[in-house]
């Protein structure tokens, strides 16, 4: 019985990994989120991002500059990173990574921050074709 239990556990783990990989989700891979300031050439963007577990600090981005971080999403699809954006007299908030929206769709999440929205191009797509209004 002991050997059959071990074999069952090993086969279950392998099956989970194979099914997850077939659906575009690798539970062991790190996700990269990149946020780029594309507001206007003379605008400096202050960005401050955090999750429940991590505070990534405050960063100043000149036009065209980017800030990125890497992490492993939770297997339970609860990972959430929220960023606060400040420029001129504007203060905006946005979820730059939400497991329910992004996990399995974007391992390299590239955000273009504009004055009226945040736009994403996922993985190898270079077009910022999905835009979301500010929270």
UniProtKB/Swiss-Prot annotation:
Organism: Arabidopsis thaliana
InterPro entries membership: Self-incomp_S1
Subcellular location: Secreted
Family: Belongs to the plant self-incompatibility (S1) protein family.
This protein's name: S-protein homolog 29
Endpoints of the signal sequence: 1-24
Glycosylation sites (chain numbering): 110
Record's keyword terms, sorted: Glycoprotein, Secreted, Self-incompatibility, Signal
Gene Ontology BP annotations: rejection of self pollen
Any one GO CC term of the record: extracellular region
Pfam families from the UniProt entry: Self-incomp_S1 (PF05938)
